A protein has these predicted regions:
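Charge-dense, helix-prone N-terminal extensions
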Residues: 1-142
Length: 142
């Protein structure tokens, strides 16, 4: 009996552009309140939005830096990428505050692949935003 290894398992239907935009807009609405003071949007177009901290005198890993990325969202081909830079700090207290449902969506070091959005997941994103903001503030980056 031969087994055909070329047959691929059923794949999840690809999200439409409108579905991706809906997810993008909901996450952006949670990010926007943080755009104040030293935190500014460097890119703010339909499909990409990012927030950077421009605090004068920041020193990161022993080097002076004019800015550091806080969070970015980008519509990709099959998901909305939520790039959450505070997770790079390797701060155990920050990781402990991350909602488990959101952590399941982490792909790579700092990118969460958002393919659905409901009130619970949106609240998880809000929780992550607050925890990341607090961590950056504690490090003197905001």
């Amino acid at each position: 009996m031969k087994i055909n290894f070329a047959v691929k398992p059923a794949q999840m239907a690809k999200l439409t552009q409108e579905e991706l935009l809906q997810i993008f807009r909901k996450v952006k609405s949670v990010m926007q309140p943080y755009e104040q003071g030293n935190i500014v949007a460097q890119m703010n177009i339909e499909g990409k939005y990012d927030l950077w901290s421009h605090k004068p005198g920041m020193v990161i890993m022993g080097k002076p830096r004019p800015a550091i990325n806080f969070v970015t969202i980008i519509i990709q081909s099959g998901y909305v990428g939520f790039y959450y830079m505070p997770i790079y700090t390797q701060n155990p207290a920050l990781v402990a505050k991350m909602p488990p449902a959101l952590m399941k969506l982490l792909k790579g070091k700092a990118c969460f692949h958002l393919k659905t959005m409901d009130d619970a997941l949106l609240q998880d994103v809000a929780t992550a935003m607050k925890a990341g903001y607090d961590a950056y503030k504690k490090m003197g980056w905001i």
